Amino acid sequence: VLSPADKTNVKTTWDKLGGHAGEYGGEALERTFMSFPTTKTYFPHFDLSPGSAQVKAHGKKVADALTTAVAHIDDLPGALSALSDLHAYKLRVDPVNFKLLSHCLLVTLACHHPAEFTPAVHASLDKFFSTVSTVLTSKYR
């Protein structure tokens, strides 16, 4: 459960990303594909080479979904319901992949914002990404 302090840390950090959230989403997705090659199986139609426009575009979609989640941090199930349906029923993404992408998002954010990435912020973002992952996989059951 996200505490009030966690919610503040997440919102403050996300605000500091400014217009870079989409860029970071693409970088994190590319990092996921490079670090965990099995995640590529869901994207056979993509050009997965470094710097791919398709990977960047999908990374922006990920970042946009997270921006929506941050804006609706008190109602994540409601805010992410359609996305949960898509991943559970149509795409059938293995839930472990959300954890892998979450890890790569944390690494990417830490690389770009080392001063702001305090232990408390790291813990709050980790809890937030874990909560988002749980919501996205809730309809798998």
From Swiss-Prot:
One of its GO terms (cellular component) is haptoglobin-hemoglobin complex. Keywords: Acetylation, Heme, Iron, Metal-binding, Oxygen transport, Phosphoprotein, Transport. The modification N6-succinyllysine is found at residues 7, 11, 16, 40. O2 binds at residue 58. PROSITE patterns: GLOBIN (PS01033). Pfam families: Globin (PF00042). The modification N6-acetyllysine is found at residue 16. Heme b binds at residue 87. Belongs to the globin family. Heterotetramer of two alpha chains and two beta chains. This is Hemoglobin subunit alpha.
